[in-house]
Amino acid sequence: VAGLQAATQPTMQDYTQYVNPFVGTGGHGHVFLGANVPFGHIQAGPTQKKQGWDWCSGYHYSDSVLVGFGQMHLSGTGIGDLGDIALLPVTKNNEREVKFSHKAEYATPGYYAVTLANGVRVELTATPRTAFHRYTFPADAKQEQVVLDLSQGIGWDKMTACSMKQEGQNTVVGTRFSTGWAKDQRVFFVAEFSQPITHQVM
């Protein structure tokens, strides 16, 4: 009986190997590129400059400049909103946008990675309510900084109020209120870093 049962068990297959997350990120697709789980609150992914309707998801394949990695994105809606709590790893002061090449990008369901032109390797994954970011700075980087931008949004999203404060050595807590397609959106966040925060500029 045991042998018969084993013979009738279906073999598990990894169907995610057939998924191409880049489909729909060009043209008028408005597809979000990044890391999320089904029905999750978090969609961690790259965010580009606002350049019109085709950038509604925060990302368009024709573009090669990033302004951050936001925690919330819409996908396939044609609605320009979200992009909240953008983080950007930089290697020099006043760096607020970074170029990248699609050859340096990799995406699979639940995971996104890119090596930026400044040499920083960015990796993203997510749970239903948490985004995980890993930044690997180049060995010769003179500075290792992370810009946390609360003003950045997607499409017609506009910040109406925000707050941010450091708690302990590694944690930043804050709020971001905005208006856009969602007329009164309120986001509350906690950002915990693996290294102590040694300096901050508000």
Region spans (language model):
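Boundary at the C-terminal end of the N-terminal hydrophobic targeting segment
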Residues: L4-T8
